[in-house]
Amino acid sequence: MKKSLFAGATLTALFSGHALANEPLTLVLDWYINPDHAPIMVAEQIGAFKAQGLDVRIVPPSDPALPPRMVAARQADLAITYQPQVHFFADEGLPLVRVGTLINSPLNTVIALDKQIKTPADLQGKKVGYSVSGIEQATLATMAQHAGIDPASIKLVNVNFQLTSALLAGQVDAVIGGYRNIEAQELKLQGKTPVVMNVEDYGVPAYDELVIVAHRDAIHEAKISKFLTALQAGVGYLRAHPQKSWEAFAAAHPELRTELNHQAWLQTVPLFATDPAALDKARYETYEQFLYNNKLVKKVTPLTNYAVQLH
């Protein structure tokens, strides 16, 4: 009798434990952990993922090009990427769909240290450093046209992701591709007074800098929607407690406790999407047309093929 009771209790415990186990979800970041990922880190800090019944594994990539392709291959549930890349993936026919937004404004800027450069019109005859061909060239050309100058009058110099150092060394007069919350802050901490031109202020359609993609066949899985709910809780807590959440983040990642990361954390707080699930359809369609007009995609892909709003 006792043996039967013990066996029954053991089975009950096993089944109860199984029922209470959190569902695993793998999220691959776009880059190493940094302040741009604050709501994700905060959601983890405050237990928002566990409250949704999720066991979220946050993975920095070995190669920044891999995360979306890992999702396309069903090797991860979600990946952080950039809205422009989502359009390129759709053009390639990859089964990736934007399901959420982390940062819902561009971070890209043109930055100059020369006091004579105040607007894109002042870039005529100047050297501008860049790192990513195609999209940054089209962005700069649009800004130049908006300012009434010939894009060909600007000399582009590939600085291989050394934007700040190229600017400080005087190799270029300005750079495009620096983030307003990172490179601009880095220059200020070095005692410089950078001129920062936000791309969306000069004719470039606004877009979401960082977004979350899932495999097309998985977008209606409950855990995707639960992740977004937890992420929204992370954003809310971060907004209410920016300094407290920074201290918790820095304690968990002491190697990232620098003044630059602290300033970037605080500067980025207002830029996170209040509702990560919300989709601005017109914004995506306008940016798709922008890419097509600049011959960066072969065709105009219908929005429903690459972006959804789950709740």
Language-model region placement:
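Short, glycine-/small- and polar/acidic-enriched structural segments
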Residues: 24-159, 164-169, 173-181, 196, ...
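Sec/Tat signal peptide C-region and signal peptidase I cleavage site
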Residues: 17-21
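C-terminal solvent-exposed extensions
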Residues: 288-311
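Pocket-lining segment of extracytoplasmic ligand-binding domains
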Residues: 84-85, 162-252
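Bacterial N-terminal signal peptides
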Residues: 7-16
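Bacterial N-terminal signal peptides that target proteins for export
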Residues: 1-7
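Short helix-capping segments at alpha-helix termini
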Residues: 48-51, 146-151, 190-192, 222, ...
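Secondary-structure end/capping motifs
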Residues: 220-296
